[in-house]
Amino acid sequence: MKLVLFLNMGGATNLQDCEVFLKNMFNDPYILGIKNRFLRKFVAWIITKARVKAMQENYKKMGGKSPLNELTQSLCDKLNLKQDEFKFDFVNLYVPPFATEILQKYTLNASDEIILFPLYPHHSCTTVTSSLEVLQNEISKQKIQAKVKTIDIFYKNELYNEMIVSHILAKKSKFDAKILIFSAHSLPQSIIDKGDLYEKHVNDHVEILKEKLKDHFDEFILAYQSKLGPVKWLEPNTSDVLANLNDKALIYPISFCIDCSETIFELGMEYKHLSKYNYDLISCPNDSDEFMEFILKYLSDLN
């Protein structure tokens, strides 16, 4: 068996899971860099209690749940129907399904392979490193003897970028805008200053896409969303960019592979009132045929 596990932070599937998500996220040492585990747990509890009601209110506007789990499950189901070389499943970091329960579903031996596939095109310790570490620790804990392969970044992949360009131009054919905003999830500047490669990878990716799209847009803007708290984060903020738009625009959520609250609610709903001009949101790759084609080709090349 070649078991491919997509890794992601996950999205709450009900309002009660909002607290679970926040608690686990802020207990992650890669997210909240407090070395003392007990102090980190206490601070995480305070942050969770302060934020959970607002998060639940936001989720109510999306129908009470994030679309991330359903879309990822659909992606796995479609891939499993499409071929029989790989078995696809997914693991979340902060809400179910967790690594423990997913790995226990399968009987794996030394002749099998586990391919860990974080659904993040750019590397960051807060996403890729954290996810891989949790999975590798659980594999070791369960004494699974299968060979483990890991996939890191894929933002330079030609097929992946052709897919993005195709999705952007398809949306542009219905909503003709001359400005394209690439919105990436922000990170605290302190994490970047410690050597995290995320900002560099995002900048590199934007340059690749700008070159491919230069004949279709007059202006490209990279902005960062989802800032939390008073510390310095990567800039400019997507909300500020939208507030200062001088024409209609398209937004592509460049750091996301699957639509989630940050895309559907934050970009699609919360920021709508900020701009004097209309903007339209381009969907993430999700469970599209083009994304499946990229995944299967990437895995084939890996082997």
From Swiss-Prot:
It comes from the Bacteria. One of its GO terms (biological process) is heme biosynthetic process. It is found in: Cytoplasm. NCBIfam families: hemH (TIGR00109). Belongs to the ferrochelatase family. This is Ferrochelatase. It comes from Campylobacter jejuni subsp. jejuni serotype O:2 (strain ATCC 700819 / NCTC 11168). GO terms for molecular function: ferrochelatase activity; metal ion binding. Its EC number is 4.98.1.1. Keywords: Cytoplasm, Heme biosynthesis, Iron, Lyase, Metal-binding, Porphyrin biosynthesis. It is an enzyme of class 4 (lyase). One of its GO terms (cellular component) is cytoplasm. Catalyzes the ferrous insertion into protoporphyrin IX. Pathway: Porphyrin-containing compound metabolism; protoheme biosynthesis; protoheme from protoporphyrin-IX: step 1/1. Fe cation binds at H185, E262. PROSITE patterns: FERROCHELATASE. It catalyses: heme b + 2 H(+) = protoporphyrin IX + Fe(2+). HAMAP family: Ferrochelatase.
